[in-house]
């Protein structure tokens, strides 16, 4: 681009051409020419070019005085471009900003309502306390403007200014005005008034007249505005059942809306207003289930489907059988992401757990069994767990619906049979099948706890398909799976399985690698088998007890249990000992499940329907921090950083004192020892090093920096804010310098550049370094070597106009900073800047 004409001839694509170094100067000249010629088309093209540069991150703030010259133009497009530029650079040009305020205020009373609204929005977006007074005046005037566009803009500007300075507004005056504007006839003004009131006075209460007005105007709002209104209405409590029904009748058609946010907001109102009317709420549940199913299946976004699915899952905590007839809609699709498949499995589990039709339960169980071979271990585990829970939940109905036998014969036993093919499969198949087998064994234990009568059926399969091809030790099973197999052997010790020899082999090969709970289960199983087969089990039991009692330090808990079992066997007869150990076999009824407690917890977040609480599965107080908590955490973080820095300084000083004391003590104690000469030699060497260090001629050579220091930007910022200025040096440069050359020289010496850039004609560079204490003469003891290394942080500012370089140093150890680091830093800096010491 070499002339002004290029702006006219280049077309729309010219805004995205390659940036040239001389572009800003050319734009400045062309803009001045276009202003003098009063050529609106040229001004538009130039301003569009400037805005493009601004959006890609290029600093065009130098053009601020020239751009504000066209702010008084009557062209709306030019005004939009100018105001966009001014708002973006308002903070970096606070002095020049006052030159635009008069233009903005003049536009706030323009005849054109679009210009009035544009000027008002820009004036409120300056985010400067210098313009706050002027903006407040215009806001108060515009709240009563005859144009709805200006009034709704003024309301949003009011919310912005209130957060900028709460003292600028008298709430006793401004809040009644906002309430009056809620009764406005313009729908957008009403919505903005509600939103502004939410910002200024959260939790404000409705009146009947206000609700009636909102309901009358409700159909005029757009769908997102309706969501805002409904969210506020969820805080309103109708005075009677008739009032509730009137509101719900007006909102009924919103349940079938294609916007999922609007549908969920409407459902929240329906559930809230019928909470005290059980019969009506049952009808509401029936009314909302089909819209939810439709939204879940018709949504093109997986994220939306996931959100709807979570709300369906939450509704099932209130109405467990609500979706019983719709269970096929929750079958996993081949292209569903894992997070949706996992949630669908949970929904299917709850549907089947509360299902009464055996055919439906069988279909769900068969569907879940197919997911076991999906390939993902997480989904496999969820599916097996769901199958187990479904069977357990139907324990009391097994006479009518023998779910336990169906689960055992169609799912668990076939999986155990498949596992016998492990030996002939490839490595990949072995890994997958072993993972499935582990989940099966763990769930099988939970299944048999509820249905112990099936133990005699399961153990032969385990003996044939797992133990019969080698033994449990041939499989790389996790500890929980090993513990499950051992538990099953102990619960049926009189079976035909060779339990003593299985236990012996497991003890010989795997015992030492197992965690405590597996060792404890092995010990308990050994005792139970011993009571039924003492002749075979006695030698093995002696070895196990001896092993468990031998080492107290390794496993004190197991040691105590083994001593307890030993005393039972020695002090009591076999029958009494067996009655004590086998007391857990007494018949107990399992009626309460963890899922029931989870449902109660889910019921507590029902009031936060259509919020993130539903997705997170926790109340908002658990993941949203208030301002006080955030402020306390910030103060605690700064305090921790301060203590850390103080510990570095104090640690080095204490180490030096301790070393001196230790040296004096060693000198006194070693006077009569044979190694006196060696100690004297060490002391002389240390004294010599101290003399070298204290010598000005060796001030730099004995100071070594870490060549690969690490410091995060967050920690750098925290240190910079918490440390006081250590030393500042000003250097007048003769000519501009190459930042990359300085960075290259510094990095070779262990001084690393964290960030650099140019802002407002000022180049900024930030460096950090750490001292390598392994070369320090006081860094001798192992304790000292564990101390953090001293940190040095540097800021270099170069004025691009005057070429004045200002260097600011900070460090928690000022003595080392002044005596060692600064001379070394300046010595390194003299390489790219030779005249630095002149």
From Swiss-Prot:
Q: Write one Pfam family the protein is assigned to.
A: B2-adapt-app_C
Compartmental location: Golgi apparatus, trans-Golgi network membrane
Instruction: Outline the segment boundaries, as ranges, of region: Ear.
Output: 674-838
Q: Which family does it belong to?
A: Belongs to the adaptor complexes large subunit family.
Main function = Probable component of an adaptor protein complex. Adaptor protein complexes are vesicle coat components involved both in vesicle formation and cargo selection. They control the vesicular transport of proteins in different trafficking pathways.
Q: How does it assemble?
A: May be part of the adaptor protein complex 4 (AP-4), a heterotetramer composed of two large adaptins (epsilon-type subunitand beta-type subunit), a medium adaptin (mu-type subunit) and a small adaptin (sigma-type).
Record-given protein name: AP-4 complex subunit beta
Q: Which organism is it from?
A: Dictyostelium discoideum (Social amoeba)
Task: List the lineage, top down.
Answer: Eukaryota, Amoebozoa, Evosea, Eumycetozoa, Dictyostelia
Gene transcribed to yield this protein: ap4b1
